[in-house]
Amino acid sequence: MPKILIFNYMNMRKTFLATLCLFSGMTMYAQQIDVQPTPQQVKEATATIALSGNYQFNGEGEANPYAISALKSLLNSKQSAKEGIRIYIGERGDKSVRKYNKFIPKQDEGYFLRINEKEIVLAGNDEQGTYYAVQTLKQLINDNQLPVTEITDYPEVRFRGVVEGFYGTPWSHQARLRHLKFYGENKMNTYIYGPKDDPYHSSPNWRLPYPEKEAKQIKELVQVAKENAVNFVWAIHPGQDIKWNQEDRDNLLAKFEKMYELGVRSYAVFFDDISGEGTKADKQAELLNYIDEQFVKVKKDVTPLIMCPTEYNKSWSNVKGGYLTTLGTKLNSSIHIMWTGDRVIADMYEGDTEKGGMKWINNLIQRPAYVWWNFPVSDYVRDHLLMGPVYGNDLHIANLMSGFVTNPMEHAESSLLAIYGVASYAWNQDVYDSQKAWRDAIKTVLPSAAHELEIFATHNADLGANGHGYRREESAALKPIAERFLNEYLNKDTYPMKDFLKLTETFTLMQEAADILMVNTENPALIAEMKPWLIQHKLMGQLGCEVLTLTNALEMDTPNGFLRKYKHIKALQQQMFNVDQPYNQNPYQPGVKTAGLVIKPLIDKIFTKAVELYNQKYNAALDAKTDYMPHTLTSDVNQIKNLPLRQKTNRVLVSPANEVIKWQGNGTMTIELDKVYPLLPIDIDFGQPEVAAWGVLEISTNGKDWQKVDYQQNKNRIRVNGDKTAVKAVRFTNRTDKEQEVYMRNFTITVEK
């Protein structure tokens, strides 16, 4: 037998070389085992065995049937042979693996995997654990060889997965099926179905059963989830129009019964992003306890209920009002409570009971919070793709959470990079490596063009300015080079040649990567999602190269060459504008933004400086403008002050927000235009009737003297005809002392140009 070394990932990444004895049937082997997610403990071996194709299965009659099916598919073996490698598979207590009980970890979903020249043991602490043992075995097979090893493994976080809880276009049925398989392969056990734009999930149709087509699809999702060891959780969002009476209790239970008939065995109730009567904590607790006692506990095979509270983050919590403490004391202890962190979009940290973090919320709700992590969700920055690494959450807080689920983008395939990282993080936080997980995800999602996808994802990670103030690193390796180049060029009219060459290489690689990805056929769904951003990404690379060439033409004193490049740059800017107009035209943040954190500001500043130098040198008046936002928004309302302004032709609009905005008494929002314009319509939708009872609309020609504008409302919509009145600024004020709960669905100023 070869000498075997214990490699404990808690003392991670030790370099070693084991001494190996030679014997028949085994091959020399010296390589660290790489499994996703990283196991808790591995015995590294220095030998491999060859798979013969003949296997003696032990435990088929007792073990998880889905694990058995996955194993036979993996080994391409339909039945047990009379000779060959003996395979023992089963759960703790099964006859087939009873002699290995002492090796099986006692944690939920834990497993023990042993591979040697005589046997393969796949022993789970439960059925999930057995399935995960098979998934690990699948990753270990390389060119029909297996390493001689032992793995003892289990997850640190009990529930790990995805909540489809974003606003926007729900995923397609086929995308969900692909995702469920991906979750199983990466040991994620939870998929919460809660798309905000599913009419039968939310108001007003949550009381109605799904039509036949949709019901059939959900039934298939439930079955595929089971086959991949994923818990399909169906969520309902009744809070906006629920009545706290027996009729709606019965309506909710009837809907749950309908879902139960479709195979659903796990449920969630969401009370997020609502206002009015549905936000009362005592009523929510009463209803959820009723469901728990009359449905969950009665059914026996239904898992504990999950709820998303109305106050689901610290910044919106009114601790003195008692909402969270009411849930903590009145809600049955088996019910999970979801939490997004200190803000709507936030990373998780340990904290303390006084200031914030996981300890703060757990103290209030008297149980570990079930984390709803709002990344890479992009429903508030829909003109961006968020394809960067998963990072920012503390690495030693697994014991402070009951679950960790990621809320993804509406772009299902593009979300897989982050989902892969979350799978790795939630399984084994202590050794989580965000960069490794990100690069491994890229290789998994698009192996044939991993290099090109990494280039693209590197420059499509940040969110840009947004109402939540949440940002991500982007183009990180390029940032110091860009800063050094700009410092020299803006202050000394020169630049380091090595930085010039590195930037040129980067911009060239951007173009090449976009071209290669656009014709890739390995993952058509992914390429289709990325296509608008790939087009824009290539143009950005071209723009960068031409701007650098512009500086060189100026330095070489070739004005004709400068003008030729200037003309081309203007054409590229126009092309980027043209891409921004037809693609991704959602009503919230339409258009296509790429490489916005480091690269675009770098290109814009170089261009502006080069044109200014040219104008000075040749007494010219070339336009040095790049695209920019000439108008400004100011507000003392916390949830409004960071909302981006957007301009589409002659319309200036406030970027809509998905969540309820708490507009304090006497709070204002002011939009100041860059100059005086003839005013056309102003369109407003705050998602509530009778806005005139508290809201005052005013306009100004100078930003100092204000004139009140009367308006009328049709349902939730307000339109004021501007009649070409001169306007420089528009202001809206809550004139009362009372806080108003509104939605920023539309605030658009249209002017004549």
Regions found by a protein language model. Give the residues of each.
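Bacterial Sec-dependent N-terminal signal peptides
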Residues: M1-Q32
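Acidic, contiguous N-terminal accessory segments
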Residues: M12, A30-E117, D143-T152
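Feature activates predominantly on carbohydrate-active enzymes
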Residues: Y100, P105-K255, E261-R265, K297
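Catalytic-core regions of glycoside hydrolase
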Residues: R265, I274-R439
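Disordered, acidic Ser/Thr/Pro-rich linker "stalks" and the adjacent N-terminal cap
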Residues: I599, K605, K609-L679, D685-G695, ...
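Extracellular carbohydrate recognition and processing domains
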Residues: K704-D723
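Noncatalytic modules at the cell exterior or secretory-pathway interfaces
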Residues: G722-T736
